[in-house]
Amino acid sequence: MAIERTLSIIKPDAVAKNVIGKIYQRFEDAGLKIIASKMVHLSEREAGQFYAVHKERPFFKDLVSFMISGPVMIQVLEGESAIATNRDLMGATDPKKADAGTIRADFAESIDANAVHGSDAPETAAVEIAFFFPGMNVYTR
């Protein structure tokens, strides 16, 4: 197994519910280290650029609107198979289909307000980390 890095975003719905600490605890309990983090309120331009891969999808406009509706917590996670571990912790995109005990099952409201984002592959993780943490001001600990 390899040490990986992945980007995680705690979305506006979960930030508003004040569950950042509970989600961070799940990351750490699963062996992931939080090696960079910041809270930001994304602009429409930033959210549009970050989710540009979905630009032609029917949900793009709603996704951008949701992501700018309040602050988000952005973090880089590091650990053994960090991408798969984080995706397992998050659960299915639709919280109604997410396994009990996953972040989305416990904290998400809907398929749109689904609490968290996580990179889906090493290549996207690298791009997403560089988007929010340019210059790789991210440190192993």
Curated annotation (Swiss-Prot):
It is found in: Cytoplasm. It comes from the Bacteria. GO terms for biological process: CTP biosynthetic process; GTP biosynthetic process; UTP biosynthetic process. Its cofactor is Mg(2+). One of its GO terms (molecular function) is ATP binding. It catalyses: a 2'-deoxyribonucleoside 5'-diphosphate + ATP = a 2'-deoxyribonucleoside 5'-triphosphate + ADP; a ribonucleoside 5'-diphosphate + ATP = a ribonucleoside 5'-triphosphate + ADP. Keywords: ATP-binding, Cytoplasm, Kinase, Magnesium, Metal-binding, Nucleotide metabolism, Nucleotide-binding, Phosphoprotein, Transferase. GO terms for cellular component: cytoplasm. InterPro entries: NDK-like_dom, NDK-like_dom_sf, Nucleoside_diP_kinase, Nucleoside_diP_kinase_AS. Its main location: cytoplasm. PANTHER family: NUCLEOSIDE DIPHOSPHATE KINASE, NUCLEOSIDE DIPHOSPHATE KINASE DDB_G0292928-RELATED. Homotetramer. Belongs to the NDK family. This is Nucleoside diphosphate kinase. It comes from Aromatoleum aromaticum (strain DSM 19018 / LMG 30748 / EbN1). The lineage of its organism: Bacteria, Pseudomonadati, Pseudomonadota, Betaproteobacteria, Rhodocyclales. The gene is ndk.
